């Protein structure tokens, strides 16, 4: 790894001489948002662009500390009730006044979003009631203590009830049974700027899939005005064209420049900033019955056997991946979040031991291995397809003949959510900045109604872990909750229910005169890009 510990490695963008002259900013992104609907898909690509338009009751800063946004303060009234004081004088981009009605409408809509690849119900599952408290506050009740509610609501961007066509009065009821919702707009409707209405510093001008997203400054924004009149976000999914666009001046900033190109970029006078992120790159495995797509097993699913899953982990040389594939811009992972984040326990990285891996396969009844397909995106994570190819080669050395099926992110996520892959490579960035996020999303037993395991496409299930996690999430005492999260994570990792590979280190490249503070969550937020003074 090229920098220090997680929280000390964050550095501000280098300030170079001269200020940016243009009032417009063009950013080259490594992947494209799947929707303009802020409640459709828990995907950082979506979140980072929509944070320019929408805001929640709370926000998270570059280190994921919870800060005020549309709520100026909050307090726990009792074990199951929180009171959020709403910011006065806030206007949506359509001119309507922000009020408790918009909060109620937003939280009501979450379970009504159709065909969500990764539902936001994970943040609303405990909410039993949302109601006004006077003219400038809301009371949010939960079905048990929820110490993370102020963090959860940062992940629920608030919609304009007027723009969505709600009735004058919206009454909250759990499970999508709210009253006064009107005809609820779905994801495709948010391609229209008339529906995509928030309170943020930018408004949506246009979104052309495969081409660009254009934002214009919202002059009546309640907070600090951004530096740019117009922002254009272009998906440049191939590394070469993305770097070429920067060096030619077609874009002002890019995310995830290839590691091997950094010297050339810096020599050309551009600044480079980087930070270790909280994103874990991991392998998930089909642990839900038979897997006919796996060859050489007489129809059995070898991934149901813990010994096979452990063999896969021991076959992977994480240090080699970090150095050879990631160029040192990553850190080998032993947990679902990098220490010292809340809930980590310092578990060691699984040792590279191919001989023991072969022995475990033999003990499991697969001395000759088997054949399997590894699914991966090829444009979503840093060097994702290359990492998958390296993993495939390592697995082949212990007898697991691995075919890599690499696709664009949109194709990959669609197939992953259809449970097409017996094993797949993906990533997760903890929106809460602590261990409950990956546990609830990646390894909790899948239950659509309960909002658990929305991204658990391997269908791993550990009822004891589920129960411990449930208890942790209703424990107010931080020390006790952390112990429970540590134990819950240990249960999953001891079971090899999921295999951590590495934590990404995120890199940005900017033209002269621009600055950007790297974020732990890896977001590229245009409104936070500044012209050097």
Residue ranges of model-derived segments:
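Bacterial N-terminal signal peptides that target proteins for export
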Residues: 1-8
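Cleavable N-terminal signal peptides
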Residues: 9-10, 20
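Extracytoplasmic/periplasmic ligand-capture domains
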Residues: 60-62, 87-118, 129-131, 196, ...
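Long beta-strand-rich cores associated with HINT superfamily self-processing modules
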Residues: 508-533
């Amino acid at each position: 790894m090229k920098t220090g510990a997680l929280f000390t490695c964050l550095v501000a963008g280098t300030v170079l001489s001269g200020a940016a002259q243009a009032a417009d900013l063009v950013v080259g992104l490594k992947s494209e948002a799947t929707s303009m609907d802020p409640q459709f898909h828990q995907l950082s690509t979506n979140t980072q662009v929509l944070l320019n338009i929408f805001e929640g009751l709370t926000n998270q800063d570059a280190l994921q500390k919870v800060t005020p946004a549309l709520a100026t303060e909050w307090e726990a009234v009792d074990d199951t009730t929180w009171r959020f004081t709403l910011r006065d004088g806030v206007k949506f981009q359509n001119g309507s006044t922000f009020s408790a009605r918009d909060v109620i409408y937003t939280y009501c809509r979450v379970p009504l979003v159709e065909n969500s690849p990764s539902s936001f119900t994970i943040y609303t599952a405990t909410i039993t009631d949302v109601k006004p408290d006077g003219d400038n506050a809301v009371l949010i009740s939960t079905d048990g203590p929820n110490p993370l509610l102020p963090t959860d609501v940062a992940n629920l961007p608030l919609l304009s009830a007027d723009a969505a066509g709600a009735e004058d009065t919206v009454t909250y009821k759990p499970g999508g049974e709210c009253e006064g919702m009107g005809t609820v707009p779905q994801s495709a409707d948010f391609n229209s700027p008339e529906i995509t209405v928030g309170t943020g510093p930018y408004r949506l001008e246009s979104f052309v899939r495969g081409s660009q997203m254009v934002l214009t400054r919202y002059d009546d924004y309640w907070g600090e005005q951004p530096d740019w009149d117009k922002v254009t976000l272009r998906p440049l999914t191939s590394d070469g064209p993305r770097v070429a666009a920067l060096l030619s001046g077609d874009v002002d900033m890019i995310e995830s420049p290839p590691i091997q190109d950094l010297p050339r970029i810096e020599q050309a006078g551009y600044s480079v900033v980087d930070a270790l992120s909280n994103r874990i790159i991991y392998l998930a495995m089909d642990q839900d019955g038979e897997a006919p797509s796996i060859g050489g097993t007489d129809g059995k699913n070898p991934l149901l056997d813990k010994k096979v899953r452990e063999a896969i982990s021991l076959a992977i040389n994480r240090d080699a991946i970090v150095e050879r594939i990631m160029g040192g811009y990553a850190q080998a992972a032993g947990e679902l979040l990098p220490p010292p984040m809340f809930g980590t326990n310092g578990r060691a990285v699984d040792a590279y031991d191919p001989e023991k891996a072969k022995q475990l396969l033999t003990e499991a009844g697969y001395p000759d291995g088997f054949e399997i397909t590894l699914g991966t995106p090829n444009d979503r994570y840093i060097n994702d397809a290359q990492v998958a190819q390296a993993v495939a080669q390592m697995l082949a050395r212990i007898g697991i003949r691995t075919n890599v099926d690499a696709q664009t992110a949109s194709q990959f996520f669609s197939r992953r959510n259809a449970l097409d892959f017996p094993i797949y490579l993906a990533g997760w960035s903890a929106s809460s900045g602590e261990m409950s996020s990956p546990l609830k999303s990646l390894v909790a037993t899948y239950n659509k109604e309960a909002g658990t395991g929305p991204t658990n496409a391997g269908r791993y299930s550990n009822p004891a872990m589920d129960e411990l996690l449930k208890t942790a999430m209703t424990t107010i005492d931080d020390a006790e909750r952390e112990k429970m999260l540590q134990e819950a994570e240990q249960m999953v990792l001891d079971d090899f229910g999921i295999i951590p590979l590495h934590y990404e280190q995120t890199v940005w490249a900017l033209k002269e005169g621009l600055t950007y503070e790297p974020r732990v969550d890896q977001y590229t937020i245009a409104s936070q890009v500044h012209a050097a003074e």
